[in-house]
Amino acid sequence: MKKLVVLFLAALFLVGNVQAREERGTPAAKLAQDDVEVSTERTQLNINNMAMWIQSDGWSARDPLTGNSGVTYPRSTSQVIFQDGIIWGGRVKDGNDQELRVGGQTYEIGTVPGIIESKGIAQDRDTARLYRIRRDWATADLRLDASEVLNIGLSQVTDAHEEAVRAQYERDWMEWPAELGAPFYDNDGDGQYDPSVDEPGLANADQVIWFVINDLDQGATTTLYGSLPIGLEAQVTLWGYARTDALGDVIFKKFKVIYKGTAEAADDAVIEDMYFAQWSDPDLGDYGDDFAGADVDLSLGYVYNSIDADPGYVPFGLAPPAVGYDFLQGPIVPVYQLDAEGNIAVDEDGNQLLDESSVAIFNEGLRPGYQNLPMTAFVYFAAGSAISDPELGEYVGTQQWYNLLRGFQPQDDVANPVPYTNPLTNADTKFTLDGDPARATGWNDGVPLPAGDRRIVLATGPFEMALGDTQEVVVALLGGISTDRLRSVSKLKFTDQFVQDAYNGFFQVPKPPVQPNVRIVELDETIILDWGWDDDSIQATEGEGSAGFEFEGYNLYQLPSAEATLSQGVKVATFDIENGVTTILGIALDEESG
């Protein structure tokens, strides 16, 4: 196979990345060049086309150094999320007079770092931290990573900065807290994490962040929405894939929530009518021109642009993307067998019988007799409108949030909640904006409110947790970008379907070939690309198939900038194995029709 090619290309390589990062963050002079410290309280998940800030107390998707938006998509371009968080709420029957309680994170953080060691006793938060690993930490080019987590311009990154980030990856790999619940591959099967044998992480991810939080700090919970602590521990795992397909446009977020209780909680304590929600304040480029939407069948809530050009993306020559959240795995609830009269069937001892034909995903496996709840409500509101954010620091905020969790307007009368109304049908609904903007069908944003600063809430429930119970929620933060704002919505939904299928199949999807090791020679109006010189690289790229797929050849693309997506590129050449295979079939989005 010919692997040497002479191309006539515009000299744009790597320039865009440098310019995109140059003006951000604090000057390099503020960092000690010879003693660079990489924070273990805050970091980024940034292995693919999306980058997101996270902090060890649960603060999420907001830059903790600047206070600005904290999710960038596509990576190294503009921001899409100002802040997000997970909210939980339910009727807590643990002996305390205050039953209705809500916790989690929005603009205030109702959680603190650390595990719950026993009822009402939390780990010293000063000993808890974030852990971040990536599989290629020893050999990867970490300059852009260092630029992002240290908040400095790319051209300001020194060898000391890069090696400090590399050293932190190594430390986190060696100190991975498996004993606290952090996931790992137990290669020797002894149940203990040994970094010389085992590997931290899950789901074949290329980058993983793990930390644990709890809600036992009453000062934090009351500052949020006036509630008392519940006694919940949440083990949080974020992960991503260094891929160029749909998995490269996603950040996965898993919340493993354990009800461990407050010090006063009775042994028979239970949380009834409990809900989880993904809350988000999206700012897609310019926050003043945003629309929101939902796809109920996909359990997807999202934000997109109301106009064709967004000031945040025009400098990059990009149409505005669409970004959303999907409950890939909701909380589990039992599914019971029914008798001939439609009642729950029982055995001879009076025990209710589970229907084991129903299967839920739980703990990276399958659990017969249960089902995962989907998104059970999607609501939105606009900053400054009649329906706005629940009140921080006051118990009325708890009441408002509990109505939101159940799909009602954020008012404080829990017994008499006010529903949302579809303005096209005048029917009450728990799923606002559930039309299809790409096809102009159903209720889409712009009615009754004009474009502006949006909040979105995806809720799932109800379910019950007894003391000692564990529930899991897995949320995907996804992006889609195409040639215009509405095609970006279609691309987002296509990505979501791919990601849900991959998740349901435990990520048994074909991996793309390893990128070849390319040598570049620049001549007068000519660039020579040579990827036939490194035998090990050739073997890594061509020698191993994946999930039934075998290597067939190379496509070479020219892109307008380093930030551009493959859809913006022009295919320059194909170098194909001469084996009679002329067509490779696959599922792809028709970007013209959506």
Regions found by a protein language model. Name each.
Residues 6-18:
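Hydrophobic h-region of N-terminal signal peptides that target proteins for export
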Residues 20-594:
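Extracellular/surface-associated beta-sandwich interaction domains
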Residues 1-4:
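Positively charged n-region of N-terminal signal peptides that target proteins for export
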